[in-house]
Amino acid sequence: MSKLWSGRFAAGAHPSAERFTGSLAFDRRLWPQDIRGSLAWAAALERAALLTPAEHRGIADGLARIRDELAAGTFPFRPELEDIHTNIERRLTELIGPTGGKLHTGRSRNDQIAVDERLYLKDVCAAVGDGLREVQRVLIDRAAQGIEMAMPGYTHLQRAQPVVLAHHLLAYVFM
């Protein structure tokens, strides 16, 4: 199977170069965002009359099946396809035929990865925020138990005046 970028080359890349440049091991975690971005793009293509409603439905149904396969761990990854985007696109074309290729109308790989990364970061930042709020909740609960508990305060890594544990813990809540 030829690579997307292989049109001008007489021979394939050396296997070590393929291992070095392949990103599937890293970007496979982007599959939820890749599916979301592709669903949104397919809807935009239909609104622009570049896909018929039936083509849009077919793409959406195919992407839903791929999402289910990925979530269940049954998706047939093909490392020779290099990245998650190409794996999903090829699987979509296998499932629904040539209409799957229309999904990239007006969208470059750079557009696709930029969307995927932004969606991924948005999702991860939300999860980090949830985790931080949980840490704050635990610190507040522990501070409530340490209202009268003294501990040494530090200045320039030297023990200084005594402080209340609750005050010390609540300082971390507001950092």
Feature map (PLM): residue ranges:
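A helix-coil-helix interface module used to build multimeric assemblies
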Residues: M1-M175
